Amino acid sequence: MITLTHVLGSDIPHHNLTVLRFFNDVLAKCLPVEQVRHFMVAAKETAPFSSFPQLDINTYSDKKALAEAVIARAQADRSARFFWHGQFNVTLWLALLSGKIKPGQVYWHVWGADLYEDAKSLKFRLFYLLRRIAQGRVGHVFATRGDLIHYQQRHPRVPASLLYFPTRMDPALTAINIDKPLAGPMTILVGNSGDTTNRHIEALKAIHQQFGPDVRVIIPMGYPANNEAYIEQVRQAGLALFSQDNLRILTEQIPFDDYLNILRECDLGYFIFNRQQGIGTLCLLTQFGVPFVLSRKNPFWQDLAEQHIPVFFYGDTLDEPMIREAQRQLAGLDKQAIAFFNPNYIEGWKQALALAAGEHP
């Protein structure tokens, strides 16, 4: 049996730990060790990895060191196969483009930012062009329905399969309907992180225009680190629209259970990033019967529609009765059948890893 090496090529602690936890706690119990055990991870902080005894994790101090190790292994053994989980590592894309890594060696699971080209500088525009070419040279691509449609417009000949990120969810909560209070001001969650792709200030202005100053707004901004200047910009913009009592900015990473309690309080989510992003938060809101607003440029709306989940589009007319009706629809939805919920996404991972390991034609 072919041994797969899983590559987490950027130091993104939250996402990387979610993947590692899923492999250690779930997949290691039901799949051959050759498919799930071996990882190469870019990480400065390695202490959390001691919680994953079922995995063999080689760590590298930065993206370049990891890429050099992957390239060396790929060149030394052309039968070696790598499963890339997201890929924000320039050196790896250039290695694939130059032939140092061969297409048949790479199986790639797309993460949100992988396909999108937001930066405007000449340097990034050149990189985007090269990356786009390289992305057409992988052996197989895995992604959400919306991202697959986006990808296959550029690379129709590359084999592709549906696969969802292993969002951390408690399946026991899926069957519980949470009653929303119909009186009092609504609570709205804005964005899924402190990243500028959330367009927080634009979202706050739209919320104020649609619902007035009396709604409560919660903005999670505990990630990324060293983001104080942007957080302060968002705070000042928010205070110009909402009272201090109605504006809550979360500037620290918070425990998972505390985050769930915050999501339960919400009546609406507001996510206007122009790409696939924040699927974990969208899943948790759906689990708790909370509808949300998305940009039409976020292709994940196609996955939501496929699962009959109501969604509002940014820029459309929106009022409180429409939100209450969407909450009613979500309460009546068979959430246990949603493809990207835990445990339903596990079967997709079993199929993906078997395919990457050569167990399927």
Curated annotation (Swiss-Prot):
Q: Is Amino-acid biosynthesis a UniProt keyword of this protein? A: no
Its EC number(s): 2.4.1.325
The record, for Pfam families, names:
Glyco_transf_56
The entry's cellular-component GO terms read: plasma membrane
Q: Which UniProt keywords apply?
A: Cell inner membrane, Cell membrane, Glycosyltransferase, Membrane, Transferase
Task: Provide one Gene Ontology biological process annotation.
Answer: fucosylation
Q: Which InterPro entries match?
A: WecF
Annotated pathway: Bacterial outer membrane biogenesis; enterobacterial common antigen biosynthesis
> What is the first-listed, main subcellular location in coarse terms?
membrane
Highest taxon listed in the record's lineage = Bacteria
The UniProt GO MF terms for this protein read: 4-acetamido-4,6-dideoxy-D-galactose transferase activity; fucosyltransferase activity
**Reaction catalysed?**
beta-D-ManNAcA-(1->4)-alpha-D-GlcNAc-di-trans,octa-cis-undecaprenyl diphosphate + dTDP-4-acetamido-4,6-dideoxy-alpha-D-galactose = alpha-D-FucNAc4-(1->4)-beta-D-ManNAcA-(1->4)-D-GlcNAc-undecaprenyl diphosphate + dTDP + H(+)
Compartments in which it is found: Cell inner membrane
Q: What's the protein's topology in the membrane?
A: Peripheral membrane protein
Its function, per the record, reads: Catalyzes the synthesis of Und-PP-GlcNAc-ManNAcA-Fuc4NAc (Lipid III), the third lipid-linked intermediate involved in ECA synthesis.
HAMAP family documented for this protein: WecF_RffT
Q: Which family does it belong to?
A: Belongs to the glycosyltransferase 56 family.
- Spell out the protein name for this chain: TDP-N-acetylfucosamine:lipid II N-acetylfucosaminyltransferase
- From what organism does this protein derive? Yersinia pestis
Lineage, opening ranks: Bacteria, Pseudomonadati, Pseudomonadota, Gammaproteobacteria, Enterobacterales
